[in-house]
Amino acid sequence: MKLPRLLYFHFSSNAINSVEFDRGKILSMSAQLIPVSDNGAAQSRRRVPRHVGFIPDGNRRWAVQNGLAKEKGYENGIAPGVALFEACKTLGIEEVSVFGFTQDNTRRPVAQSDHFRAACVVFAHEISRRGAALLVLGDEQSPQFPVELAQFRTRQGEGIKVNFLVNYGWEWDLDGLKEGGLRSAEVSRLDLIVRWGGGRRLSGFLPVQSVYADIFVIEELWPDFHPQHLEAALSWLEQQDPTLGG
């Protein structure tokens, strides 16, 4: 049976202009990304982090390198995200946090912001269908926040915890202290952060939870994700000494 194409077109203050993604293509692409195996090497891992953060950078650069408009990179980043989610489930990771887009990102051209917002909607609903206990964290009062994700502003589901940062800003997060607590208070301390695209920075990614996190950088661009990237990050983490400042 042919899966329907996904069309997002809304008449509201935070409308996403007409952006169409082919769900069948996305699912086919994610299925081709072989998940991290649960063989003896994975099962004998001495240190499986409880909470891992992911910064999937390089969508626009990937699009340009492949002769596409920059906004097309975001669609090609959905399937890797689904495959990464499945790999984390297989490994028994309890909680993951994923950068969708930041408040600063919304300054990009409209075509790009429409596409990354729509891509976030597709990804969020797909992992929710796959059993994620999903929390979308970001400024929902802004017109840049996709209305389709409002239902996930309180955590939904009972599986692996996924904190999806959508229209997130570190200042917005910390401003919650004026009202009694971090806006990300429900998110636990990070053990490991993995960033694609070669950047050596956190870009405001959960600054409080990141305080003792080890950081692993992957040079490949996000749409070129392969499960071996995650395996490499976890193997590297086993060699680190988690002193937590002690």
Predicted regions and their residues:
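N-terminal amphipathic/basic-hydrophobic helices that include classical n-h-c signal peptides
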Residues: 1-31
